[in-house]
């Protein structure tokens, strides 16, 4: 079997097939349920004392993390943990399984990065932590988060593996005991190929993490890869799963991988809104979109903007048009080579470009703190995709602005679905525009 056959690029593909057998309801987790405001906490292993924690901690020091981690946290400028971090970290470091759904930008990544680094006792030549996500860009970003927080842990080695790059380079890393990673981050296709080729050994894995887990477990082919990798790990390990959206249907599937997990749902169900993010729509015809976009980019103040379109072809065309109009734009989508995608991602993250035209490959998990404007040039197909997209402009409770173009009957149906799903009434964008002080931090 060729490696290319193993390496499916899941970035822009939605596989609609569902596995009916896998959606059988799992038994509910044991343990009490504690409802505090918009935060629901349940589960946790009953035999573990101290499995439950209030949300009154005021600093990362309260979690009793390693001193090296606390130094790195201070260097990053973090003072107070977010709500989801306060609830999850104290329990997760006790080796309890965690299923966490919290809206975009609330620091879910730091939960598993800090937890696994705190627990890790690195052994040369052994992989102890495995983190999987559905896109290469997100894998690259998670690897960078590990680098940030492990700066005072010199013995910890992290590597990222994803499709679109020569697999031989990955094999070279895994063939050398000096470079063999203690923490592996990657996409399921490439990781499964490395496991099948017996280049990556998972027999010492102690923590198994899925980020944006619903995206991976919803798609049947990706779920099979995840299951195959899961079976290659020891039975006695900690499992943690995170996402901004976890439907009632996907939760039992997640829990099939777990043992009595701590379940944390922040702003559950219809309350999945992004505080501080102003959301508007504009009704117009398809032919009016370019002129209106030009007007918005000319009139609005913003640090960085991300413009979402529905296809790679439209991304290229719009990017070309913007550059012809002297807007500093780049395009990121699955049609761009992997090396070029990472290069463009870094250009945008490092503020060398202010405008990014993207497909849904940038719709989940990507964290670029300067984005404060998101424009849906093409409305997404469903409400959850909308949440992930506009969430790029409201990270960690900061202010932001999102504007969606509505140009067809299908768009109007999606708009109604968004309003129904999140129990909000999206206002039409005012003719006189909006005051920049209301969305500029």
Swiss-Prot record:
PROSITE patterns, alphabetized: HELICASE_ATP_BIND_1, HELICASE_CTER, Q_MOTIF
Alphabetized InterPro entries for the sequence: DEAD/DEAH_box_helicase_dom, Helicase_ATP-bd, Helicase_C-like, P-loop_NTPase, RNA_helicase_DEAD_Q_motif
Motif (DEAD box): 211-214
Domain spans labelled Helicase ATP-binding: 89-264
Protein's cellular compartments: Nucleus
One Gene Ontology cellular component: spliceosomal complex
UniProt: ATP binding residues: 102-109
Catalysed conversion reaction: ATP + H2O = ADP + phosphate + H(+)
Domain commentary: The Q motif is unique to and characteristic of the DEAD box family of RNA helicases and controls ATP binding and hydrolysis.
Family: Belongs to the DEAD box helicase family. DECD subfamily.
UniProt enzyme class: hydrolase
GO BP, sorted A to Z: mRNA 3'-end processing; mRNA export from nucleus; mRNA splicing, via spliceosome; subtelomeric heterochromatin formation; transcription elongation by RNA polymerase II; transcription-coupled nucleotide-excision repair
Domain Helicase C-terminal, residue spans: 276-437
EC number(s) from the headed UniProt entry: 3.6.4.13
Protein name listed in UniProt: ATP-dependent RNA helicase sub2
Membrane-crossing segments per the record: none
Subcellular location, principal: nucleus
Biased composition (Low complexity): 19-29
GO molecular function ontology, one term from the record: ATP binding
Family annotation (SUPFAM superfamilies): P-loop containing nucleoside triphosphate hydrolases (SSF52540)
Keywords, sorted A to Z: ATP-binding, Helicase, Hydrolase, mRNA processing, mRNA splicing, mRNA transport, Nucleotide-binding, Nucleus, RNA-binding, Spliceosome, Transport
Naturally occurring in which organism (per UniProt): Neosartorya fischeri (strain ATCC 1020 / DSM 3700 / CBS 544.65 / FGSC A1164 / JCM 1740 / NRRL 181 / WB 181) (Aspergillus fischerianus)
Chain segments carrying region Disordered: 19-43
Keyword Cell membrane on entry: no
